[in-house]
A protein has these predicted regions:
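A short beta-strand element within beta-rich, extracytoplasmic domains
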Residues: 119-130, 200
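Intrinsic-disorder/low-complexity, polar/charged segments enriched in Ser/Thr/Lys/Arg/Asp/Glu/Gln
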Residues: 107-111, 122
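Positively charged n-region of N-terminal signal peptides that target proteins for export
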Residues: 1-4
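Hydrophobic h-region of N-terminal signal peptides that target proteins for export
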Residues: 9-17
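Predominantly extracellular/luminal regions of secreted and cell-surface proteins
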Residues: 48-92
């Protein structure tokens, strides 16, 4: 009897996994505007090498809808140095200044208003990938509070020394910017994170103090 129960559970587990599908991120072509710099950081992830993508984010089909579009409201911590807020949701991932939102140096954030609470499965952010630079203090959060004072869920944080002064030392790794951006799962205990607002932080990069954002996409239902 035990064998039958174990077999049934194993079959159910396999069946459940088989029902999941990968979230499809539309990637821009690789782009390099300079020789990648040697970057020394104890918090930098092992280099995957050009062209090698991260493992797919697997979710149930109902959570694969892209929730962001050109009508998504975008706000920022400070007025843009160059570019427009809507650049980060217009679908154009061209890695140059014509599609780039640039915020001043220091800790800055870009916030998306999805219009209503959604069940969020993943967030992906693209910064400037020009010389495979590394952006500092990359943090992604979800909340129903537009001021992010209450009910905040952090799905990614590589600010390992709390230099952003948000009060938490992150455990995620820094990474080189490439054409696949940084996709992050918002599934916690196999359940999506509920929220209306998505906020993405950064604190300049290894190439310059300015914070460059190409695109931010949110998926879920």
């Amino acid at each position: 009897m035990k064998k039958l129960v174990i077999s049934a559970l194993a079959f159910a587990s396999v069946a459940a996994f088989a029902e999941k599908v990968a979230i499809k991120f539309e990637l821009p072509p690789p782009h390099s505007s300079g020789t990648p710099k040697e970057i020394k950081s104890d918090n930098l992830e092992k280099d995957r090498g050009p062209g090698k993508l991260r493992p797919p984010i697997m979710v149930e089909p109902e959570y694969t809808k892209k929730l962001t579009n050109e009508d998504t409201k975008v706000t920022t911590s400070e007025e843009a140095a160059t570019g427009e807020n809507e650049f980060v949701v217009d679908g154009d991932k061209t890695p140059d200044a014509t599609a780039m939102l640039q915020l001043p140096g220091g800790v800055q954030w870009v916030q998306l208003d999805l219009g209503a609470e959604h069940e969020i499965s993943a967030v992906c952010v693209w910064h400037d990938q020009g010389d495979e630079r590394v952006y500092k203090d990359v943090i992604m959060q979800i909340s129903n509070d537009p001021k992010f004072k209450e009910g905040v869920t952090t799905i990614f944080n590589n600010d390992h020394d709390d230099s952003s002064k948000l009060g938490t030392k992150g455990k995620d790794k820094e990474y080189r910017e490439r054409n696949d951006g940084r996709p992050v799962s918002a599934m916690i205990d196999d359940k999506p994170t509920k929220g209306r607002y998505v906020r993405c932080y950064s604190n300049g990069s290894t190439s310059e103090p300015i914070n460059n954002y190409i695109e931010i996409e949110v998926f879920g239902k």
